């Protein structure tokens, strides 16, 4: 089934951190707590005008004085105050949404599977052993100041270059990461909290995007 024919729910939230809770079988379950205050619909895209169906949602209150004129006009058209973060969710039921409509964490149900998209923690410049899990060079037997080096990165005059994609040292982390098929443990609609089994990308306080599982059954 194509994405255009599927119904999706996606919300922006803030990762608060991890904790442990007991389930109905008295098992200790590690969960990540995501705070999802109401997201508002700021635009509805239709196949007739835009070529596809989707909704644009906004999250995170900001001081209206800090919004530029184009953004202020965009939010005024939707009848909402300016927000800091915007994203689009492609869904087949886009016609059921209206400008200014609020979507709460209650859109997710316990036991269902979700995908979580976030930005991984930045590690700075890292070597190949940390960045790519290289084994390294022997501690002895002729190894002289080579213990954490990558070794050869290519041949000689043929091909006289380093191939693209060669795993080398460089900046690590700070990338978009998607974790698939995490199970929703519980939902606290009053406090706007979503508890997801397992870990999600990013540091505490970072923005994450939670959606229905694309590949989940």
UniProtKB/Swiss-Prot annotation:
Q: List where the protein spans the membrane.
A: none
PROSITE patterns reported in the protein's UniProt record: RIBOSOMAL_L3
What does the entry list under GO cellular component?
cytosolic large ribosomal subunit
Assembly description: Part of the 50S ribosomal subunit. Forms a cluster with proteins L14 and L19.
Function statement: One of the primary rRNA binding proteins, it binds directly near the 3'-end of the 23S rRNA, where it nucleates assembly of the 50S subunit.
Family that this chain belongs to = Belongs to the universal ribosomal protein uL3 family.
Q: What is this protein called?
A: Large ribosomal subunit protein uL3
Instruction: Give the source species.
Output: Clavibacter michiganensis subsp. michiganensis (strain NCPPB 382)
- Phylogenetic placement of the source organism: Bacteria, Bacillati, Actinomycetota, Actinomycetes, Micrococcales
Q: Which gene encodes it?
A: rplC
């Amino acid at each position: 089934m194509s994405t255009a024919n599927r119904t999706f729910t996606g919300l922006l939230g803030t990762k608060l951190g991890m904790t442990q809770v007991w389930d109905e079988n008295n098992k200790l379950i590690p969960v990540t707590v995501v705070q999802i205050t109401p997201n508002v619909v700021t635009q509805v895209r239709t196949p007739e005008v835009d070529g596809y169906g989707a909704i644009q949602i906004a999250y995170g209150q900001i001081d209206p004085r800090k919004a530029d004129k184009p953004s202020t006009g965009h939010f005024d058209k939707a009848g909402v105050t300016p927000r800091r973060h915007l994203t689009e969710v492609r869904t087949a039921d886009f016609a059921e949404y209206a400008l200014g409509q609020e979507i709460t964490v209650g859109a997710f149900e316990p036991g269902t599977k979700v995908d979580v998209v976030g930005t991984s923690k930045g590690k700075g410049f890292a070597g190949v052993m940390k960045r790519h899990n290289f084994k390294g060079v022997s501690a002895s037997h002729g190894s002289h100041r080579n213990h954490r080096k990558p070794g050869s990165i290519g041949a000689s005059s043929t091909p006289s270059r380093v191939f693209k994609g060669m795993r080398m040292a460089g900046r690590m982390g700070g990338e978009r990461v998607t974790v698939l098929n995490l199970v929703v443990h519980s939902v606290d609609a009053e406090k706007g909290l979503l508890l997801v089994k397992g870990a999600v990308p990013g540091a505490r306080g970072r923005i994450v995007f939670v959606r229905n599982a694309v590949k989940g059954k």
